[in-house]
Each structure stands twice: as structure tokens, then as C-alpha cells.
């Protein structure tokens, strides 16, 4: 399908994201890459997951395909708010071969962390100690309700495009942008739609 849409002619002119999962992990992905079409190899990205195969496993593939760092998955797997200065991110960036890299961003559901302060980053270990379940912390929120977590996510924007993953999709993405940059981009988006 990607080829028929005209993509895959250049490295990362389109993104087809695959979560690194399954029993074989990086070895399984490495074994199937040679059998993919050139268009598929140009478009595939591999994303760390929150269960079995984290960032370190993803980095085994950094010379084979572009890596997408999902910062929420990393937090759910490790409890760490990874820093944009973390040494591992240099290899994530290098995997993109000069193309601007992408991270994925989401936050735990607002209807699960109901009592949590919206201006303080959730402490993963404290949440687990208080009976919150890892499986429920994985779920994506409707909106980007936590300003402290949002500010952490934006700290990656100098080097990465941020792909928003939320249940409210574009509404949440626009609200996130407006919160972080104190600008209302609705009029810009309306002008783009009107001129199309």
C-alpha cells in the first residue's frame, strides 16, 4: 500500500511504525528485514514497548532502521523520566540518518489518576506503592492534562518531532501545543483547511 501511495522512495518519506514485541524481539526483526521491499525498509520505524522490549533492546536495531522513542512506554517500563541528554538518545537520533527523528508522547489517563496534581509529574514507584496498576498506567489519556509531564515532553522538541498519542487525537494535540507555546494555532489550522 505504501508503494502504491508513492512513498518509500527515500528513507523516512513515510513512517510505518512497528512496536518491538513478540518472543524474538530485536533478533526476530533483524531476521525479517532483508526480506522486506526497499520501500518497506525505507519506511519502517521500530518503537520501544512498555512490557518486554525497552529502549536498550530497540538500540540493537539502530543501524538497521529508524527508532521511535516512546517516552511514556519508557516511563511505564522503568519509572524513569528519561532526559533528552541521555546518551542512548544519540543512537536513536543517529538511526534516522539525518532525517529529523520522532518521539511518541502520551500520559496516563486522567480518569485513572483522578486525585493526582496536574502540575506535578507522577512518581511511578509511589503510584505502584499506593495500589495503582501498571497495566492501567499504560493507557493513553484523552487530553494532555498534566502540565509538568507536558513540559518534560516538550524538552525533547529541540531534537525531535513530537507525535501525540491521545484518545482525543487532534483536539488534544492542539490543546497541548496551545498549553506549551501559549499560542492558539486554531486559526492557522483553519486557514490551512480553508485553502485546501
Sequence positions of predicted segments:
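Active-site acidic/histidine proton-transfer and metal-coordination neighborhood
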Residues: 1-66
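Active-site-proximal loop/turn and secondary-structure-junction residues that shape catalytic pockets
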Residues: 20-24, 48-52, 71-75, 107-111, ...
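Active-site flanking residues adjacent to catalytic metal/cofactor-binding acidic residues
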Residues: 46, 69, 164
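Histidine-acidic metal/acid-base catalytic patches
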Residues: 65, 76-196
Amino acid at each position: 500500500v505504501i508503494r502504491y501511495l508513492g512513498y518509500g522512495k527515500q528513507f523516512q518519506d513515510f513512517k510505518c511504525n512497528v512496536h518491538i514485541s513478540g518472543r524474538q524481539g530485536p533478533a526476530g526483526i533483524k531476521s525479517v528485514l532483508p526480506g522486506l521491499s526497499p520501500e518497506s525498509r525505507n519506511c519502517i520505524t521500530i518503537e520501544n514497548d512498555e512490557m518486554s522490549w525497552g529502549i536498550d533492546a530497540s538500540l540493537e536495531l539502530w543501524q538497521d532502521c529508524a527508532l521511535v522513542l516512546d517516552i511514556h512506554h519508557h516511563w511505564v517500563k522503568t519509572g524513569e523520566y528519561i532526559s533528552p541528554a541521555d546518551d542512548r538518545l544519540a543512537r536513536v537520533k543517529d538511526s534516522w540518518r539525518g532525517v529529523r527523528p520522532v518521539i511518541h508522547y502520551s500520559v496516563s489517563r486522567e480518569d485513572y489518576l483522578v486525585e493526582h496534581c496536574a502540575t506535578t509529574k507522577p512518581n511511578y514507584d509511589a503510584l505502584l506503592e499506593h495500589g495503582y496498576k501498571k497495566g492501567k498506567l499504560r493507557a493513553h489519556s484523552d487530553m494532555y492534562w498534566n502540565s509538568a509531564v507536558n513540559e518534560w515532553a516538550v524538552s525533547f522538541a529541540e531534537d525531535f518531532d513530537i507525535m501525540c498519542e491521545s484518545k482525543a487525537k487532534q483536539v488534544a494535540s492542539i490543546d497541548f501545543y496551545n498549553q506549551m507555546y501559549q499560542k492558539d494555532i486554531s486559526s492557522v489550522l483553519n486557514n490551512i483547511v480553508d485553502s485546501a
